[in-house]
Amino acid sequence: MIGKQTKGTSFGGCVRYVLKEEKSKLLEAAGVEGTPEQIAEQFELQALLNDKVKNIVGHTSLNFSPEDSARLKSDDVLMLNIAHDYMKLMGIENTQYIIARHIDREHPHCHIVFNRVDNDGKTISDKNDFRKNEKVCKMLTAKYRLHFANGKDHIKEERLRPYDKAKYEIYKALKDELPKAHSWDDLKDALADRDIDMKFKAVSYTHLTLPTNSR
C-alpha cells in the first residue's frame, strides 16, 4: 500500500473528481452530506473558521497492489478500516471528511478528502507529512498483511509524455541491470545495449541520458 498526498485551496474540483458517479462509491462521510456541490460548499464554510490556512484541502489516495485486488474487491469494510487507521495515525481527526473508493483501475484504491480546518477552527498540521505518510503506510501494510504497491511497476506507458517515458525506460533498465552488474563498466555496457548513455558528472553520482534518436 502506498499513500499519495496532495493539498489544495478549493474543494470543488477535488470533491467532484472523487465522487464521480461512474467510477466512485462513497464509503463514509463525516460532517458533510448531499450532492458533490453541497459537500464542497460545506467544506468551504467550515474552512472560514480559520482564514490563516491557505491550503484547506487535504487529499490522500491509498493505493493497493493488484495482488490485493481479490481480497479488497468486495470488502468495503476492510478498506474503510484501513482508511480509518491511516487517518488516526496521520492525526486527521475531529474534522469533516469523505472516504470513497474508485473502481476504474486494476489496482484497488480509495480517496480521503478532509478539511485541514478542524471542527474547532484549528489547523490540522502537515508537518513532516511525507515521512509520516511513508511510515504509516508501511505499518498498515504489515498490520493488514498487504503487498507493497510499487507505483512505477504499474505505470501505463502509453499514457506517458515523451520526457516521462524516457525517464521510465531508464528506471526499468536500471532495475533490470543493476543486480547483474559487477562494476560501473558492466552497467555502462548493459545500458548501452539498450541505447542508454551513462556519463559520470561527479565522483559521487552519475547522470543518465537517452540519445535523441531513442524510441
Question: Residue ranges of each PLM-predicted region?
Answer:
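N-terminal nicking endonuclease/strand-transfer module with a His-rich metal-binding environment
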Residues: 1-208, 214-215
